[in-house]
Amino acid sequence: MKIIMLGAPGAGKGTQAKKIAAKYAIPHISTGDIFRANIKNGTELGAKAKEYMDKGLLVPDELVVDLIMDRFKADDCKNGYILDGFPRTTAQAAALDTILHELGIRLTAVIGIKADSKGLVKRIGGRLVCKKCGASFHKEF
């Protein structure tokens, strides 16, 4: 099962992706988690991403795609995965399409989550960040 979960920041992608991942025993892959893991493990891609992040800049699409592609090669992705919040740009979508084609991967589903702007503001405004791992969470959602 190979799923992509799309939606605005705060729409609940991560929350729903975690539930689906647990139910089907597949990894939940988010770009934030990939960045944190690669930085923590001192990988070359992680070091490159950290340079941009430390400057408050967005990590370039090409580097994000490289990190995603590297993650797809992990053993735990052999039976599927749920990709949370990627692609975010047209360029990322085109690159992902190329990667999936090259790797012979067919998606099972693409799920879009919609939320009204008031709900998004409430979710984003109440986000907290774990001091130990850097993951964001919300006490209510």
Q: Can you annotate each of these PLM segments?
A:
Residues 1-141:
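Glycine-rich phosphate-binding loop of ATP-dependent small-molecule kinases
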